[in-house]
UniProtKB/Swiss-Prot annotation:
The keyword Hydrolase does not apply. One of its GO terms (molecular function) is quinone binding. The keyword Hydrolase does not apply. Pathway: Cofactor biosynthesis; pyrroloquinoline quinone biosynthesis. GO terms for biological process: pyrroloquinoline quinone biosynthetic process. This is PqqA binding protein 1. Pfam families: PqqD. Belongs to the PqqD family. Coiled coil: none annotated. Functions as a PqqA binding protein and presents PqqA to PqqE, in the pyrroloquinoline quinone (PQQ) biosynthetic pathway. Monomer. Interacts with PqqE. Keywords: PQQ biosynthesis.
């Protein structure tokens, strides 16, 4: 089954993506705690706005990182993990 890049990701209610100086990086805050995101997840997370579809996020990051062939696959993997962990909803 292929990933539908026309889906629009949005953070679930109660989840907030932000930079946390104490963690020296981006985190995902939620009522029960916090998840520290790695650099690539932070780049993807920064583009999740409830407006852009996955294809637009891929396009944006492919422009920022030309010549990196796995960008699209990495973004799809992030979306699948984030959905499985209930961080995002895909509509």
């Amino acid at each position: 089954m292929s990933f539908d890049r026309n889906q629009v990701p949005n953070w679930r209610p109660g989840y907030r993506f932000q930079y946390e100086p104490a963690q020296k990086g981006h985190v995902l805050l939620y009522p029960e705690g916090m998840i520290k995101l790695n650099d690539s997840a932070s780049l993807i997370g920064g583009l999740i706005d409830g407006q852009r579809d996955v294809a637009a996020i891929i396009s944006e990051l492919e422009q920022q990182f030309p010549g990196v062939p796995e960008v699209a696959d990495d973004i799809e993997q992030f979306m699948e993990v984030a959905r499985a962990e209930h961080w995002i909803v895909l509509a």
